[in-house]
Amino acid sequence: MKRNIVIMDFSGIYQEEQFYEGEQISWIDLSDISGTNCYCDGDAQAQILERMEKYPVSGIYFIDSGNYHYMSRIGIGRVKEPFNLLVFDNHTDMQLPAFGGLLSCGGWIASALEEVEKLHEVWLIGPDEEAYGQVEEPFKDRVHFLSRERLAEARPYMAEKKGSEEELIRSLEIPANIPLYISIDKDVLCPEEAATTWSQGDMTLEEMLKVLLALCSHFEKENGKILQVDICGECDSDKSMESPKNDHANKELLRFWKKWF
């Protein structure tokens, strides 16, 4: 069966990278659609969905820079069964835009919680405690945080004790009997590991991959289902000299996810 690896090209930055070379990929050119940078209007959403129509939900989707992280909201809108959402991000992405009718990269999770009936709960890995405090009350009952501070506290323990990632995943209590959609913004990584358009966290790529392995192993053991993974966090197209770091991170993430799709 052909693996579904999709490159969603808004900015042209993927043309500066090579992580997908030698892979059977699908390339969706979205660079001609106006009204997409950071915010996405209704007309743009309709055009994007039309171009995605022939591609299945299941698969590995690369969705450009964090300016286009709202693509995750568009992606989960195609899911037809009840599911949970796990997000790696340095930000909560729960700030609804001031203008109605627009989907934003900084508010797509809030939009999903309000509008996607099939979405049960959200797990966010990476934002700091202060960001959690700013989440609006109606959302807090359905959003679970693994904060930047808690990750920092766990880091020495994870480095010393084998199996600590499994303990961390168990502590999150993500149910394996409900399908899971995963979204990764590389801005959760430290600047040495990725170069993004937004402020960054301090997670290493190795730490992320260990946590993902523990999660996927848990789901495999429990016969759970991972619906899709999408990955964003490229740099601006006019800063392509930073692309090698992202290219390496994308290559390692693709290598990892190919084992699970």
Describe every region a protein language model picked out:
Residues 96-102, 133-138:
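Active-site-proximal loop->helix
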Residues 2-63, 67-84, 117-139, 143-261:
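Catalytic cores of soluble, metal-dependent hydrolases
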Residues 85-97, 104, 108:
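Long, hydrophobic, well-ordered secondary-structure blocks that form the structural core
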